[in-house]
């Protein structure tokens, strides 16, 4: 059976087409005639003419197509050959669209590929590198985050005399929204735990209350009981207190050292002043002794009187110098006392 015989039962004859066309034409003409009596008569008359022309044109094209199909079928072309040609056409079309799709996908992949910024290459994260240094409290926090029991296990036992029931009354999860956001951003494992457990196994409030209970109560107490140094006992707050204490101690040492140096210099100056005063007092003492000695010869009275007057002038000068030295000494001693008082006040 050829293709024409296969299609023949579903095709109509030319007589059937002619009869159907005439019938359709009559029905449309009747409908249009009824409409022309109304308000849109002119419009429908125009539509009627165009419809008749369209039907005539369609009829002609349909008849021409049927004639061509019949002529091709009458050439006795083998069905297998026709099917083979059809298969080749399908393969060619499939190959074309497959290659076209690959080309488009490759182009889109290149267009959508975004190079990472240079600033982002060296940014350390908890997921990117396992060599990131973790201090003690960060390691403990990771242990809490990765342990599912932290969030699912009901807390019934107190921790160092503190009960969970009394503690949770004083905590507000709504007040920790900002801290929770920072924790979720910094620790991806914590976000995974929340997405996995909330709300299927535990409520949102219970999830975070149990987490903060272990984070703020249990872990710090464990650190104290283990006998670790104060530096390793984390309070989850400001971690710069130890550094500030170290800086303060260093500043105190420097101040003490500077004060000791000032005291040494003041003592040295006081010793020098004492020696100078002693020399002046000795010189004054000698001058007074010369003044009180009696004359041994009458002929030498004028010379002795003159020498005595010179000695008085010298003694007077020495006394003034001694008084000035004593004033300098007193001033130095007052300065030393003031420095000592400042050191006592500072300590």
Curated annotation (Swiss-Prot):
Annotated region (Disordered), positions in chain: 229-347
Bias-annotated ranges (Acidic residues): 240-251, 338-347
List of residues that carry Phosphoserine: 235, 241, 246
Record's subcellular location: Cytoplasm
Ranges of biased composition (kind: Low complexity): 313-325
Chain ranges passing through the membrane: none
Gene3D superfamilies listed in its UniProt record: BSD domain
Any matching Pfam family: BSD
Keyword check for Phosphoprotein: yes
Keyword terms of this UniProt record: Cytoplasm, Phosphoprotein
Identification of the protein by name: BSD domain-containing protein C22A12.14c
Organism: Schizosaccharomyces pombe (strain 972 / ATCC 24843)
Phylogenetic lineage: Eukaryota, Fungi, Dikarya, Ascomycota, Taphrinomycotina
């Amino acid at each position: 059976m050829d293709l024409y015989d296969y299609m023949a039962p579903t095709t109509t004859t030319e007589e059937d087409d002619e009869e159907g066309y005439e019938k359709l034409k009559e029905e449309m003409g009747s409908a249009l005639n009824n409409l022309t009596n109304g308000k849109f008569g002119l419009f429908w008359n125009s539509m009627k003419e165009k419809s008749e022309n369209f039907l005539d044109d369609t009829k002609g094209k349909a008849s021409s197509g049927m004639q061509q199909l019949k002529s091709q079928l009458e050439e006795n072309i083998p069905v297998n050959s026709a099917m083979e040609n059809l298969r080749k056409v399908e393969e060619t079309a499939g190959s074309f669209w497959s290659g076209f799709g690959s080309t488009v996908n490759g182009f889109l992949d290149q267009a959508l590929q975004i190079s990472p910024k240079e600033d982002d290459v060296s940014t350390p994260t908890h997921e990117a590198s396992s060599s990131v240094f973790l201090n003690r409290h960060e390691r403990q926090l990771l242990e809490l985050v990765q342990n599912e029991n932290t969030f699912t296990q009901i807390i019934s036992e107190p921790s160092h005399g503190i009960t969970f029931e009394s503690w949770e009354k004083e905590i507000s999860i709504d007040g920790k929204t900002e801290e929770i956001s920072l924790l979720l951003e910094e620790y991806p494992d914590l976000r995974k735990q929340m997405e996995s457990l909330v709300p299927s196994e535990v409520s949102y409030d219970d999830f975070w209350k149990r987490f903060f209970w272990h984070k703020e109560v249990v872990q710090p107490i464990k650190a104290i009981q283990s006998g670790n140094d104060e530096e390793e006992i984390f309070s989850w707050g400001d971690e710069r207190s130890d550094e500030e204490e170290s800086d303060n101690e260093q500043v105190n040492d420097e101040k003490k050292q500077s004060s000791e140096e000032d005291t040494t210099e003041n003592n040295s100056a006081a010793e020098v002043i004492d020696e100078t005063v002693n020399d002046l007092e000795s010189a004054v003492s000698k001058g007074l002794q010369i003044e009180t000695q009696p004359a041994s010869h009458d002929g030498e009275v004028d010379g002795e009187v003159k020498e005595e007057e010179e000695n008085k002038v010298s003694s007077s000068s020495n006394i003034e110098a001694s008084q000035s030295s004593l004033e300098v000494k007193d001033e130095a001693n007052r300065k030393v006392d003031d420095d000592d008082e400042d050191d006592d006040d500072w300590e």
